[in-house]
Every structure is written in C-alpha cells, then in structure tokens.
Amino acid sequence: MTYATAQLDRMLSCLVIPCRVVAVDLAAAMVRVSDGSGWTSAWVRWHAQAAGKARHWRAPSLDEQGALISPSGEPAQGTFVPGLYGNAGAQPDNREHVEVWRFDDGGSLIYDWKAKSYTITLPSGTVAVKVAGSEVVVTDNAITAKAAAITLTGPVTINGKLSVTGDILGGARIIDTAGNTPNHKH
C-alpha cells in the first residue's frame, strides 16, 4: 500500500469512530473518548442539542456511548455525539409519541403528546416555576405560591385547617356546614 493510499485509508476509518466517554471536563465542555482498542482521543467538544439563541446543557456521562465525527478523518478536530444506547444505559421508553428523560436518582421528565400530558417526577427536592415576580415552589411537603394576585376559578375544596393572616373578603355569603352565616341572629 502506498503512503497516499494508507493516509486515505486512515482518514476514512477516522471519519466516524464508535466510542465511549473516558473523561469529562465540565468547565471546558469537552470529553476524551476511547474506541475500546487502547486508543484515546485528545480533548474534543461534545455535540449539544442547541447552542445558539436557545442553548441546551447536558454533560455526557462517563462510559456513555456515542460517535466521534471527525472532519477529514482527523480525530483531534472531531466532535463527540453522545447518546447511543448500550452498556451505559438502555432506552428509557419505546413509544413513538413520548419524549422521556430518566435520571439515576429516579427523577424523570415525560411528555406524552397523544395523552397531552407532561409529568415531572422527583424522588425528593424542589420544583420551582418563576415568571417575573410570580413563583410556585413545590417541595417534599409544601406548595408555596407567591404573586401580586392569585385567582382560583371554580369550586375549591380544602381538607385540613385553614389559617389566614389577612382579612377575608367575600362577595357572597359564608355558610358553615350547619347552614349558618356569620351574621346569623337568634
């Protein structure tokens, strides 16, 4: 084989390299990958779902499988594309109408567009939703809603003690379970 043919063969074989993550540099957003034969790459970037005006962050896991895509067959110039199912993790679902993220701690994000359902599951911790000055925080044992005004429309049932630190204003009657109102006279 001539030198030119050998170089061409090497470059072609390095265009796409199946590999797994062996090191992660979070600050630099780079990984080192290995093809399992003893070869380990230099530090290379990993592919993100979005990196423009909308940006996405998910660092590849150690041993996560993927492919190193190398322009002109030069692995040092490559980009690691994570996310091939294999020994490091099986697929989290198998339905075409569901998008799922599952995490090692038992948490998950599941959107089922057929059912029009989005489920966020955490084994413990906090979920916070913020819009400007309004905020809803859900923790293991409490739900806190903070806003300039909160409107509930429809029947409301409260099972348990109700504590109020401010005034109660009603546009209609307040009736207890016996049918009495606060201004009931005998």
What are these regions (language model features)?
Residues M1-S117:
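Exposed beta-strand/loop interface patches that mediate assembly or binding
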Residues W46, F80-V81, A88, V100, ...:
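Alpha-helix boundary/interfacial micro-motifs
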Residues Y111, Y118-T121, T126-K130, S134-V138, ...:
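Low-complexity, small-hydrophobic/phenylalanine-enriched stretches
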